[in-house]
């Protein structure tokens, strides 16, 4: 089954730590909250520096869509931009984020340990889909997608939720592929 999740319909929700807002792209199981999800994908606009919310037993993957950000962990500092590979880290480890030179838009994937594993990759072109329960494709720019003999048009930040994915996928512009197993 394939569902298009339009960016235009997303509602801004306050962050757990009260320091900003995020827009949920998709969550599993549907309707679950921050305490009950197996996985959750959201997009945030970050304007100010501050600590990331701590999520016990959650693994996170952060991908910058626009802008640059420094992340400070207890043992390292990492700078990311819109060309960086997605960065995975434990959600229960303290992290402090600082936008560099202006606002940042990021994609945040959270997976509950013991229930789900998430893998995020930047993609373009044709590829074999990974063996996963769910695959989510998030358009970075306007993107034409072909999957399961369907041709679909995605606008910026629209997403496809594919349950029990088929063999292959073709995207004609940069996108993010999230495999959830």
At which residue positions do the language-model features occur?
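Jelly-roll (double-stranded beta-helix
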Residues: 1-181
């Amino acid at each position: 089954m394939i569902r298009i999740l339009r960016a235009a319909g997303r509602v801004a929700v306050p962050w757990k730590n009260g320091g900003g807002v995020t827009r949920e792209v998709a969550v599993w199981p549907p309707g679950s909250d921050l305490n009950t999800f197996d996985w959750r994908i959201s997009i945030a606009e970050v304007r100010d520096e501050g600590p990331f919310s701590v999520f016990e037993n959650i693994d996170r993957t952060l991908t910058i869509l626009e802008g640059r950000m420094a992340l400070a962990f207890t043992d390292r500092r990492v700078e990311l931009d819109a060309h960086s590979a997605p960065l995975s880290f434990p959600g229960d480890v303290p992290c402090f984020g600082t936008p560099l030179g202006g606002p940042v838009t990021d994609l945040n994937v959270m997976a509950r340990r013991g229930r789900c594993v998430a893998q995020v990759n930047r993609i373009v072109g044709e590829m074999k889909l990974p063996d996963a329960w769910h695959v989510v494709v998030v358009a970075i720019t306007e993107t034409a997608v072909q999957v399961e003999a369907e041709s679909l048009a995605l606008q910026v930040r629209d997403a496809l939720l594919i349950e029990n994915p088929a063999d292959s996928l073709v995207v004609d512009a940069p996108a993010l592929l999230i495999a959830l197993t």
